[in-house]
A protein has these predicted regions:
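Glycine-rich phosphate-binding P-loop
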Residues: 4-23
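Conserved NTP-binding/hydrolysis module of P-loop NTPases
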Residues: 46-63
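Switch II (G3) loop of P-loop NTPases
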Residues: 59, 76-92
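Long, low-complexity, Lys/Arg-enriched
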Residues: 168-322, 326, 330-376
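Pre-Walker A (Motif I) flank of P-loop NTPase domains
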Residues: 1-4, 232
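Structural motif
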Residues: 7-10, 37-39, 87-89, 108-111, ...
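Conserved catalytic-core segment of NTP-binding enzymes
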Residues: 89-167
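Short beta-strand-centered segment that lines the nucleotide-binding/catalytic pocket of NTP-utilizing
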Residues: 27-45
Length: 376
């Protein structure tokens, strides 16, 4: 399967391009995943979907590459879907080895010096160059050549804007063709190999319920849970918000819940041990009038599923529980199943500025309603 590295110096608009590409590919129903690798990010479009002030507080920074680089190298190499990989603007020689797991490259550079540097970097790791693009903040969008590689200019790549123009559209079409050529029958194969008899494709589920697959709304949750059998082994496949996965995981309890992880394939939501939290998964407790809030933090940014049995979480007795943090879907799913005893559960969803109730046993707090996060 292709893994396309996006390369260029800092402040060249690479993150804007990455987000624009994944949105355009999603609009064309092209299966893929965007992975940011500096340090890695669990949700590729996280920083563009949330409010800027929220982003400032949630951006992952401090992990050393020694902690996450081997895991990321392993997972890119074992990918289960085509990838877009944003490798950052200043990779170290050690971090540059991620390119060995990639197959193609896209250059976005503002000047000849950075272009030469990144072109040599891609050549060292044997990447086939798909596009050689110039970033010009105040210039004009243009397609200079449609051969191999594509050549052109992308203008105005500022946060809050989307890439556009003939060079961008040509790149989207080229990526779509590359990814689709690698994908025939892959979706069906993934669903057929699900470990649960009932495997649900998130995109198909959205359309069945009249939802936009690229813009799920929390108010759809009651219909989702009405549609799916309760207390039954379930497997969920595809791109969806954390609250959707958390709600279905809680709905399946006590039966098994599985989800498809682009890095690992099908994984089961693990059981987490009770106990005093460790450095691997930090937990801060806030107590409010209506709920307790657990603020989770991953100091190393990239968490291996194999470590789940060593991630103790604190017992909580409260009528309502809000789970906050930036976590992989498998961990959200595990947490809501572990805290089933609470009268209602909500998971943070910064894109809506609050937390979405994913399980409730009381009428006053129905599933799908958004509640405010507790503030320190």
């Amino acid at each position: 399967l292709p893994a396309v590295a996006l390369g260029g110096p800092p402040h060249s608009g690479k993150s804007v391009l990455a987000y624009s590409l994944t949105q355009a590919l999603r609009a064309r129903d092209v299966p893929h995943y965007l992975l940011r690798a500096y340090p890695p990010d669990y949700e590729g479009d996280w920083f563009f979907a949330a409010e800027p002030e929220t982003v400032r507080h949630l951006r992952l920074k401090g992990a050393s590459s020694a902690a996450w680089l081997p895991l990321l190298q392993r997972d890119i190499a074992a990918r289960h879907l085509p990838l877009l990989v944003d490798v950052g603007g200043l990779p170290t020689l050690e971090q540059e080895t991620l390119l060995d797991a990639c197959t193609h490259g896209v250059l976005l550079t503002p000047d000849a010096a950075s272009r030469e540097l990144w072109r040599e970097r891609f050549e060292r790791h044997g990447l086939a160059l798909l596009a050689d693009l110039r970033s010009d903040l105040h210039g004009a969008n243009a397609l200079a050549g449609s051969g191999a590689p594509l050549e052109g200019t992308l203008a105005g790549l500022e946060r809050g804007r989307m890439a556009e123009g003939p060079a961008f559209e040509a790149l989207v079409e080229r990526l779509a063709a590359l990814f689709n050529a690698a994908m025939p029958g892959l979706l069906r194969q993934h669903l057929l190999t699900a470990p649960a008899e009932l495997a649900v494709d998130v995109t198909s589920l959205a359309r069945q319920l009249g939802q936009d697959p690229r813009g799920w709304l929390p108010e759809a949750l009651p219909a989702v849970l009405e549609y799916l059998p309760e207390h039954t082994p379930l497997a969920l496949y595809g791109r969806g918000p954390n609250w959707l996965y958390a709600a279905v995981a809680a709905h399946a309890w006590p039966a098994a819940f599985y989800l498809f992880d682009v890095r690992c394939g099908w994984v089961q939501a693990p059981a987490l041990p009770w106990g005093t939290p460790t450095e691997a998964l930090r937990v801060a407790v806030q107590r409010g009038e209506i709920a307790v809030q657990l603020d989770f933090r991953l100091p190393e940014s990239y968490l291996d599923l194999a470590t789940a049995a060593t991630l103790p979480i604190p017992p909580v007795t409260a009528p309502g529980l809000i789970l906050n943090g930036k976590l992989p879907h498998w961990l959200w799913s595990a947490l809501v199943r572990q805290y089933q005893h609470c009268a209602w559960l909500a998971v943070a969803y910064p894109q809506m500025g609050g937390a979405v109730i994913v399980r409730s046993a009381i009428e006053e707090r129905p599933v799908g309603v958004c509640v405010a996060l507790l503030q320190k």
